[in-house]
């Protein structure tokens, strides 16, 4: 659940409680790519345009009649969930039928007239307090409505080109790797972005691999991922990739020679054994790899493999992280770092022998790929995972070093470091001349130390220490974005240094520390805007730092540059427009891939940076297919604004249905994530489940980034520490009250939903609210007690349970009386969720059982992990959400409380069965 600030959650399930992707070993494959108010006439048009929608939601759409939104209990109607369909009453009298048919024709005539007037009348614009994005679609009233299949598939997904910048072997800037594009001359190529000319030939690129397959000893190798060596002479190839956890995987590794276009096993003596991790030396002369949790070294000058460690195994990891470090610290599968000169390798030794195990059961599949023993075919496969829950023993991590020339392992003691059971190592950064910076925190992640180690002298010291808890009551997020700045006296840099993100005047800002042991930095950025996962690029020749900020408003992203001395702050993107950009820079930062991500149709182009004397610009993607679709469909409009709650100005996004009419009454769905440092209110282009709810179902969707979320200041962020859910739930409820008071909102039909942390927040909100504002909630894969979640994440925001038992008690979902006061809520969870264990949902169900609470529905997905996608589950989970929401706003769930038999139906059934019964008992 590690939340990376600034990571937009395009897909609710994709980055639930966990961080976004981080760059991994320069792999070209490692890019991660996230109505009740509608008139009858509109509903008819929707039926014509979207027959597939009917299949998903059933024949009956949301009612339009605000005064009679809930149908009488004794009237038969057709909805998908047959368990909740009351039986019909007596047959109608003929005169009643005639009267009803007459009324129906008169009503249709009236609706038709109203429909014509609605089309041709002049529409008033609804004013927004801050900024309103006009509906980017131009389909208008007659435009198609998106279907659930549309948003679950790739119909509305922007195309992204997977460009991987590559440092030239001779210092060239602007080189990039490309794979298998249209009309390409080879599977893997390196190109000069400007000249598109190859220094070896006139073909415009250097072809590293002509095909994505090759043969070794009669075995056909199919590339899964590829990593060229820094000198571009050899390609490290992964085949037969098999996923392990979210970021880790195993496979077979090969060395592919560019000149001969032939391959060989990375380890010729163990060709068929699966490897967990492999990475190039900076000099291209060796590959270090981990297999069965032990480390090995293969030098290209020999086919022999050197064993670095031999005692690795089930409880001892070398060079790769265990589950919790993979998930919550590195967001990746590597804990190995080469020194720049290739003479040393730093790596983590992780001992998790004391970490308790959690069993994951697989009832349908067998992820191990192994056949069960005879007679055990009908038993679930069980995978034990070392998972440290809050307060439980953590894995013990040590930083060790391998001297490549001497072939020996050593460690360096540093005085006053955290003890083994109170230490997290969150970043390792090589400097020059055998120096390495190590970022560590205590177990509760609120005290930061930076240690400088010299592997040549095998000495080390603490050069910087910050008590974040004392500073603002907050914590340290584990990031790996610190940049080493080498000394260059000719360019005004007499000493080595590094650029880091620090807390300055209540915001995250960039700071330059030089020399390495100087704890007092030069602050490079100031003001109300916060930097995001920065620095993004460094131009050492020109002395410039490039970075991304949450612009004038927190929902924006813009790119800036500043000099190493903090002067000449300049925007790279057009800051006069409220936009959302992302960027990646070439190795020398002379060029950049600029990604415009919204609010309009995304595009990509390669540009020269402003300091580059040779201007260059090339558009590589315009997403014309999305522009065409927008002309055909009617999508929601978006309103961005701030709402003040308890003195905090909170970003709010309101999605309004097409042809929004402020004189009507709309149901409202709140969608949230809300995890610490996260952001959901942003200006990215996205057509997602929320778009479907607003555009097709015709409901208003509101998203609030409450206290605890990112980019609205440290004061707002840190206040949630130790009491997760308290302030966040209050913010959702208070904003919901403001929406309930709006003239266009039906306050009796309000729901809230979220996934993962958002699932926790859904339950916490309806628990705190007790049915006073929200009537419905939908929680997917929720945490229900932070004692059940992993230690590194939970303790960062809640302290340990031993330190803060009352905080854990109050944050747990436990007030069953309050939950019973809601009309109904839905909980869904995957049984094989390795992140948020189904234990969370099951223990909540037990509390509800003990309290005799039954106003909820549960859907369990066998063998699905946190993403819920096993055996068609991905589609089912969203179909279930949509159907359940429609039934809720149709008043369907009001009929499930204290159900009684239909008198006339029971009489008929009893008579048919020849039974006698005292019907007075029914009254």
From Swiss-Prot:
Subcellular location: Vacuole membrane
UniProt KW Protease keyword: yes
Keywords recorded for this protein, A-Z: Aminopeptidase, Glycoprotein, Hydrolase, Membrane, Protease, Serine protease, Signal-anchor, Transmembrane, Transmembrane helix, Vacuole
Cytoplasmic side stretches: 1-99
Disulfide bonds: none
Molecular function as annotated in GO: aminopeptidase activity; dipeptidyl-peptidase activity; serine-type peptidase activity
InterPro entries for this protein: AB_hydrolase_fold, Peptidase_S9_cat, Peptidase_S9B_N, Serine_Prot_S9B/DPPIV
Coiled coil feature spans: none
One cellular component term from this protein's GO annotations in UniProt: plasma membrane
Membrane topology: Single-pass type II membrane protein
Documented EC number(s): 3.4.14.5
Active site: 756, 833, 866
Record-level GO BP terms: proteolysis
Basic and acidic residues bias: start-end ranges: 1-16
Main subcellular location of this protein, as a coarse class: membrane
Residues that span the membrane, as ranges: 100-120
Glycosylation sites: 135, 351, 574, 815, 902
Class of this enzyme: hydrolase
UniProt-listed PANTHER family: DIPEPTIDYL PEPTIDASE 10, ISOFORM B, PROTEASE FAMILY S9B,C DIPEPTIDYL-PEPTIDASE IV-RELATED
Described function: Type IV dipeptidyl-peptidase which removes N-terminal dipeptides sequentially from polypeptides having unsubstituted N-termini provided that the penultimate residue is proline.
Family: Belongs to the peptidase S9B family.
UniProt protein name: Probable dipeptidyl-aminopeptidase B
Gene name linked to the record: DAPB
């Amino acid at each position: 659940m590690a939340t990376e600030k600034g990571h937009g959650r395009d897909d609710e399930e994709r980055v639930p409680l966990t961080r976004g992707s981080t760059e991994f070993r320069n792999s070209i494959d490692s890019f991660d790519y996230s109505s009740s108010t509608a008139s009858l006439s509109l509903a008819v048009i929707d039926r014509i345009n979207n027959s597939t929608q009917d299949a998903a939601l059933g024949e009956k759409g949301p009612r339009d009649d605000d005064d009679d939104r809930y149908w009488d209990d004794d009237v038969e109607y057709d909805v998908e969930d047959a368990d909740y369909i009351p039986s019909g009453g007596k047959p109608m009298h003929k005169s009643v039928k005639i009267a009803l048919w007459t009324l129906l024709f008169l009503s249709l005539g009236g609706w038709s007239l109203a429909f014509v007037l609605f089309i041709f009348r002049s529409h008033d614009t609804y004013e927004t307090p801050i900024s309103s994005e006009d509906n980017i679609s131009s389909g208008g009233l007659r435009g198609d409505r998106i279907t659930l299949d549309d948003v679950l598939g790739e119909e509305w997904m922007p195309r992204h080109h997977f460009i991987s910048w590559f440092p030239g072997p001779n210092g060239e800037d602007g080189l990039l790797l490309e794979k298998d594009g249209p009309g390409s001359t080879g599977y893997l190529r390196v190109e000069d972005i400007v000249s598109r000319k190859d220094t070896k030939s006139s073909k415009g690129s250097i072809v590293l691999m002509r095909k994505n397959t090759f043969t070794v000893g009669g075995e056909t190798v199919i590339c899964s991922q590829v990593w060229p060596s820094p000198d571009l002479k050899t390609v490290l190839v992964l085949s037969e990739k098999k996923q392990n956890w979210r970021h880790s995987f195993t496979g077979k590794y090969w060395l592919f020679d560019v000149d001969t276009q032939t391959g060989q096993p990375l380890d010729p003596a163990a060709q068929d054994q699966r490897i967990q991790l492999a990475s190039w030396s900076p000099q291209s002369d060796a590959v270090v790899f981990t297999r069965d949790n032990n480390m090995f070294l293969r030098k290209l000058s020999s086919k022999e493999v050197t064993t670095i460690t031999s005692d690795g195994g089930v409880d001892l990891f070398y060079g790769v992280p265990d589950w919790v470090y993979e998930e919550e610290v590195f967001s990746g599968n590597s804990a190995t770092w080469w020194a720049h000169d290739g003479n040393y390798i730093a790596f983590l030794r992780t001992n998790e022998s004391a970490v308790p195990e959690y069993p994951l059961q697989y009832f349908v599949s067998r992820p191990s790929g192994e056949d069960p023993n005879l007679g055990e075919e009908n038993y679930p496969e069980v995978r034990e995972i070392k998972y440290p829950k809050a307060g439980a023993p953590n894995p013990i991590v040590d930083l060790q070093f391998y001297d490549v020339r001497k072939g020996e392992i050593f460690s360096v003691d540093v005085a006053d470091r955290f003890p083994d059971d109170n230490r997290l190592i969150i970043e390792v950064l090589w400097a020059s001349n055998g120096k390495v910076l190590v970022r560590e925190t205590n177990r509760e992640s609120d005290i930061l130390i930076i240690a400088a180690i010299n592997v040549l002298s095998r000495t080390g010291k603490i050069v910087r220490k910050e008590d974040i808890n004392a500073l603002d009551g907050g914590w340290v997020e584990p990031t790996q974005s610190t940049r080493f700045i080498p000394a260059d006296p000719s360019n005004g840099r007499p000493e080595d240094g590094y650029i880091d993100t620090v807390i300055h005047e209540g915001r995250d800002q960039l700071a330059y520390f030089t020399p390495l042991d100087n704890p007092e930095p030069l602050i490079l950025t100031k003001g109300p805007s916060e930097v995001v996962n920065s620095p993004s690029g460094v131009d050492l020749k020109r002395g410039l730092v490039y970075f991304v900020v949450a612009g004038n408003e927190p929902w924006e992203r813009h790119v800036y540059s500043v000099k190493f001395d903090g002067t000449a702050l300049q925007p790279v993107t057009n800051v006069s427009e409220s936009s959302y950009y992302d960027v990646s820079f070439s190795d020398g930062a002379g060029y950049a891939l600029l990604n415009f991500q919204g609010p309009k149709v995304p595009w990509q182009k390669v540009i020269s940076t402003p300091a580059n004397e040779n201007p260059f610009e090339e558009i590589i993607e315009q997403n014309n297919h999305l522009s065409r679709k927008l002309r055909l469909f009617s999508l929601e409009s978006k309103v961005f604004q701030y709402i003040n709650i308890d003195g905090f100005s909170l970003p709010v996004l309101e999605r309004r249905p097409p042809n929004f009419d402020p004189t009507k009454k709309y149901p409202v769905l709140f969608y949230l994530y809300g995890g610490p440092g996260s952001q959901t209110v942003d200006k990215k282009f996205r057509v997602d489940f929320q778009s479907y709810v607003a555009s097709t179902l015709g409901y208003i969707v509101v998203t609030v980034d409450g206290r605890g979320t990112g980019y609205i200041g440290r004061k707002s962020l840190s206040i949630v520490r130790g009491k997760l859910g308290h302030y966040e739930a209050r913010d959702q409820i208070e904003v919901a009250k403001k929406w309930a008071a709006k003239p266009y909102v039906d306050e009796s039909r309000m729901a809230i939903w979220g996934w993962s942390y958002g699932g926790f927040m859904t339950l916490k909100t309806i628990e705190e609210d007790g049915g006073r504002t929200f009537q419905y909630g939908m929680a997917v894969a929720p945490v229900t007690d932070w004692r059940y979640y992993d230690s590194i994440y939970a303790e960062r925001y809640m302290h340990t349970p031993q330190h803060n038992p009352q905080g854990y008690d109050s944050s747990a979902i436990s007030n069953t009386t309050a939950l019973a006061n809601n009309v109904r809520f839905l909980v869904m969870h995957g049984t094989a969720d390795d992140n948020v264990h189904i234990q969370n949902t099951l223990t909540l169900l037990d509390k509800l059982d003990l309290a005799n609470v039954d106003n909820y529905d549960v859907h369990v997905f066998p063998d699905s992990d946190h993403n819920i996608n096993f055996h068609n589950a991905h589609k089912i989970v969203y179909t279930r959400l949509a159907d359940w929401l429609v039934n809720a706003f149709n008043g369907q769930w009001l009929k499930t409380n204290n159900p009684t038999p239909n008198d006339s139906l029971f009489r008929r059934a009893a008579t048919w069965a020849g039974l006698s019964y005292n019907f007075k008992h029914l009254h």
